[in-house]
Amino acid sequence: MTDFFKDIPAIRYEGPDTENEFAFRHYNPDEVVMGKTLKDHLRFACAYWHSFAWPGGDPFGGQTFERPWFGDTMELAKLKADVAFDMFERLGVPYFCFHDADVRPEGDTFAESTKNLEEITDYFAEKMDATGVKLLWGTANLFSHRRFMAGAATNPDPEVFAYSAATIKSCMDATRKLGGENYVLWGGREGYETLLNTDMARERAQAGRMLQMVVDYKHKTGFAGTILIEPKPQEPTKHQYDYDVATVYGFLKDFGLEGEVKVNIEQGHAILAGHSFEHELALARALGIFGSIDMNRNDYQSGWDTDQFPNNVPEMALAYYEVLRAGGFDTGGTNFDAKLRRQSLDPADLILAHVGGMDACAAGLKAAAAMLEDGKLEAAREARYAGWSEGLGQKLLTSDLAEISDLVIAKGINPQPRSGRQERLENLVNKYL
């Protein structure tokens, strides 16, 4: 272990009454819920970028964090890895996630950047063997460098498309080498600032071609993980093409990839798109493309994607209810795509932020499991649609408009509204929180 987190103990479960801030109150990794441990249900992962690469800047000010690993050398990249895996061990998280740019210095050429990535992932492999920590997913940063200012796959310059494709290949290779369970595509610059200089049809076709190549390369190389798209409506672009789950599904259908690609849904991105987190999860489940989640929260007053650590247990209970209804995670998990506030300078802040987030998620999942096991919500849902399971409902599904019109006249059908009982169900949910 490094000395960055010196005097901070390994985090253990001590129960809800503990006064020890460096302990879990709700997350007992070995606790069995619905036949599975919380560790296996939640599949926690730490995000390398926010925890170890973000300098603490915002649109109005620069760096506030002073980390001993900040710099552009392989030596510092390895120090960063030492500290990262130290934190993973102290928290007991089973997974981590990274972009290429988070973990290796940028080279003067693509070949040099790739060599740096290969070297640091060799170092990661040693760390992973020593600690047992695994890779939930890898991805490519195709949005920070100025070459990507007009997009990656959707860029008007074919050379940027080529550079992006090569970068994705190198990151998929790194993910496969480390046994990553997913590969994520987030199109931060895959959108537009103005329609005045944008050929949307062309850009959409380019994005489709890139995704097809990603899927082809997955099969060619035998990558056993899941390809995931992470929706977001805007920021940093005015409009992003993978706006939300529904938009992504339409895109996948258009290119015949709905059976190949799933979604990684972020709480903050759902809010930016005008949805609740549970809406996006429920829709992904209904469409058969639910894959993984990025857990965080937004400041609802500012309207920005603030990437704060989650702390709202009722919100998380409703989210994990949809995750459990989807059968839980397969290759996916709960990645903390969350960052400290820029005034939270101390090493302890980074540990405590994750402790609080993990506890809140555990409390939310246990509440969701209790709701599901109790069965009252599902029973109410089934009762509401019971008419479609027999008799008239089944007949309507195999009839045409003329037949149904004749039926309404013959039977004198004159339907009367029934209560949706929303308040009753909301009261029921509060019983478990």
From Swiss-Prot:
Top EC category: isomerase
Source species, domain of life: Bacteria
Entry annotated with the keyword Nucleotide-binding: no
Gene Ontology, cellular component aspect: cytoplasm
Keyword hit for Cytoplasm: yes
Binding-site list for Mg(2+) 1: 230, 266, 294, 337
Active-site annotation: 99, 102
Catalytic activity: alpha-D-xylose = alpha-D-xylulofuranose
EC numbers: 5.3.1.5
Keywords: Carbohydrate metabolism, Cytoplasm, Isomerase, Magnesium, Metal-binding, Xylose metabolism
Transmembrane segments: none
Record-linked SUPFAM superfamilies: Xylose isomerase-like
Coiled coil: none
Classification via InterPro entries: Xyl_isomerase-like_sf, Xyl_isomerase-like_TIM-brl, Xylose_isom_bac, Xylose_isomerase
Pfam (any one): AP_endonuc_2
UniProt GO MF annotations: magnesium ion binding; xylose isomerase activity
Location, primary (coarse class): cytoplasm
Cofactors named for this entry: Mg(2+)
Protein localization: Cytoplasm
Binding site for Mg(2+) 2: 266, 269, 305, 307
Gene Ontology biological-process annotations: D-xylose metabolic process
Cofactor note text: Binds 2 magnesium ions per subunit.
Entry similarity comment: Belongs to the xylose isomerase family.
Subunit structure as annotated in this protein's UniProt entry: Homotetramer.
Protein name listed in UniProt: Xylose isomerase
Organism of this sequence: Roseobacter denitrificans (strain ATCC 33942 / OCh 114)
